[in-house]
Amino acid sequence: MLAAAAGLISFSASGTPVCQTVRLADDRITCEVSAPPGTDLAPVLDTLPIAMRSAMELVGVPEPPAHLALQVLPPPSFLKRLKALFQVDAFAMQAGDEIRLYPGREPLKLAFRLGHELTHWLVYKRHPARPPLWLDEGLAQQGGSAAAEVRARTLKQDLARPLPDQLAGNLFTLEELTGLRDYPRRAARSAAFYWQAEALANALRRRLGPGEFQAFIGLVSVPQPPDWRVLLRERWYFSDWDMDWLAGQIQPAAGRKQP
């Protein structure tokens, strides 16, 4: 990938790379990666194809031509002031056809954040109305997890994803989780939401299979979506037992790790 894109690099007057064009998915996706002068783009460029493949396996490929701007940022000043309180290893935010990324220093956390936001971007491209909140974030968590797992294998590292702190006291029921319209505000409650959203998305993908799961995403990602439970019952013949099974999948069993 890097060799193929070698002729697509722009240079500043000092010879420092500031922008690189990467083409993915058989040239159906063009990604313009930009960064301040002197930035080492190698970690991002090594991770980008892995993260994009992980996201595409979940959501599918957007209609070409698809263009994405990936802006690599230095750590903002407020993080320097708060460094004594907490350490952010990587963060990113997707808005339209742009992702702003601070890659940090941990390659697995970079892979997770990039996979998470690329999944959001692919959902935005394929389903502009967006799925329900729980599914939107559950998919993004799946994409991030898959990217981190692949990156861990390429680096021959172990990927540890322990359960969130205080999970047991902040869990949602299935009805509560799928009824959320806004993000939880408390940190422990938010961590439970993301964990459970990923667990529910994983359970549905396992039960439906990858192709039917993508069909499910499309059917609920419309301006006036059907009740997802009725949809599962009528199209995929889910029974009361199946719904109870789903409810159990978002509750951590003894010794169970991150989904």
For each predicted feature, which ranges?
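Short, strongly hydrophobic alpha-helical membrane anchors
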Residues: 6-7
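Juxtacatalytic substrate-recognition/specificity segment
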Residues: 17-132, 226-230
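Acidic/His/Gly-enriched intrinsically disordered linker/tail segments
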Residues: 88-95, 109, 127-259
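N-terminal export leaders
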Residues: 1-2
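N-terminal signal peptide c-region/cleavage motif recognized by signal peptidases
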Residues: 10-14
